Every structure is written in structure tokens, then in C-alpha cells.
Amino acid sequence: AQQLFCTMTKERDGLHFDFSGTSPQTDTDHNSTLPSTTAHIALALTNTLFWDVPWSDGKMRPVKTDIPEGSILNCRYPAACGTSPRIGNVLVSTVCECVSKMIYASGRHDDVNACTNGNAEFVGGPGYFYGGHNRDGIPVAQGLYDIHGAGMGAAPYRDGVNTGGHMNIPSAGISDVERI
């Protein structure tokens, strides 16, 4: 099994994420490229700390990272990385947990956000998949993405939103049942 290690340090207005000790890249497709890893870190920070900062390259200026080359988070070419989004899901949960613990430890309990969709990232990703056979006996599969309507942002002293979308897809959502 691959392991993802993350040490987060806050110094003044900056954050530093060190992923030393993370598993080396694999011969399977359980690898992520550096751009994908960086994007998933940005998503986690957008939904926990930087929610009110405009989307721009400046958003990540106060963030420094050490991501070992040749690890599952920074694989070397020509490593397969078809499961990069799955690695990213786990990374988002990891970064969110680090940030939430930092805010909680600072005593700013009102500012602690729960990560979105509970722990869905660890149980299969942003949807549910099921299958069976159609009336002609042909195997079929189906994906259900109702999780895009999951809540987010609850804190110890306040409710979150009821349908915030999926954390890894900030603009996603589901149809309003009253309008269908």
C-alpha cells in the first residue's frame, strides 16, 4: 500500500508542506504528476483557507512545497498516472486535515471547517458506481454523482452549507429537485 506523509508548518503569513517519506512512484498507475499534485493542494486550500481569494497565480504565493521527485506525488516520466485523480482525492483530505488541525490548535475554533462530503474521498471517490445486467443480459455499469450535492464547511459552532458541491470540483452541483 502506498503512503502519503505530510508535515505542514506555518510561519508568519506562509505555509510549508513537506511530503518527505511519501511512497516512491509505482509500476502501476497509482502515481500523480507534480502539476496534478499542486492543483489538488490548491483545491484543498481554496476550500479551507483561501475561499475568498480570487482565482489567480497569486493564491499560491504564500505556499511552499517539498514534494520528492520520484514519489507517488511527483512521478518521473514515463510513469503511468491514470489514477492520479484518486491520489489527488487522498491528498485533498490530507491537506484539509492538516489545515483544520492548525486552525483548531490556534484556538480559532469558529474558523475550523469540516472537510466536504465527510470522508468520501477514502471510500471510492466523488460518486457511487454500481452495475448489473440489462434486459438482454448484457453487463452494464452506472455512475451516480449525487455526492455533488453534499454539504460542506461545518464548524464546531455553526452549520455548513447543505449543498456545497464536491470539493475537488468547485463549480459542480446537482439539479434543484424543485425545478426538475
Task: State where each predicted segment sits.
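Glycine/proline-enriched, intrinsically flexible loops and inter-domain linkers
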Residues: 1-180
